[in-house]
Curated annotation (Swiss-Prot):
One of its GO terms (cellular component) is membrane. It is found in: Membrane. The chain crosses the membrane at residues 3-23, 30-50, 62-82, 100-120, 125-145. Its main location: membrane. It holds the Pfam family TMEM220. It is a multi-pass membrane protein. Disulfide bonds: none annotated. Keywords: Membrane, Transmembrane, Transmembrane helix. This is Transmembrane protein 220.
Length: 160
């Protein structure tokens, strides 16, 4: 049960990251965000297909570099938002970017830590389920919340 659930979570997260990369195509800085989401999509897909891949030196190196990159960028965005935002951060494009970076970082750290036990323990699996559900529930909430979407720039309104 646990191996199948871990693989399913990785499959769903790979789909989420791929979809997130896809919806960036009309963003002013699309080339950056497509890469930021495509890297975890591929890394996560590989984990879903073969959980033992997290022990591979190339997988570990790429994931560690991406974790570092996303963490540094997230800290910068968080600082920016802390000083400039006066409403819900999800109303700001930078807030949505920050939440994407946090999801990427959390998921890749979870996968990275699974190299000792590719299927994960109960706690790791519970965390995986929560992280997997979060972006999908958030997207549904944002899609339903017309007030939140009304303040978005045009390029955010014309995607899925």
């Amino acid at each position: 049960m646990a191996p199948a659930l871990w693989r399913a979570c990785n499959g769903l997260m790979a789909a989420f990251f791929a979809l997130a990369a896809l919806v960036q195509v009309n963003d002013p800085d699309a080339e950056v965000w497509v890469v930021v989401y495509t890297i975890p999509a591929v890394l996560t897909l590989l984990v879903g297909l073969n959980p033992e891949v997290t022990g591979n030196v190339i997988w570990k190196s790429i994931s560690a570099i991406h974790i570092l990159f996303c963490t540094v960028w997230a800290v910068g965005l968080a600082s920016y938002l802390l000083h400039r935002t006066q409403q819900n951060i999800l109303h700001e494009e930078e807030g949505r970017e920050l939440s994407g970076l946090v999801i990427i970082t959390a998921w890749i750290i979870l996968c990275h830590s699974s190299s000792k036990n590719p299927v994960g323990g109960r706690i790791q699996l519970a965390i995986a389920i929560v992280i997997t559900l979060f972006p999908f529930i958030s997207w549904v909430y944002i899609y339903i919340n017309k007030e939140m979407r009304s303040s978005w720039p045009t390029h955010c309104k014309t995607v899925i």
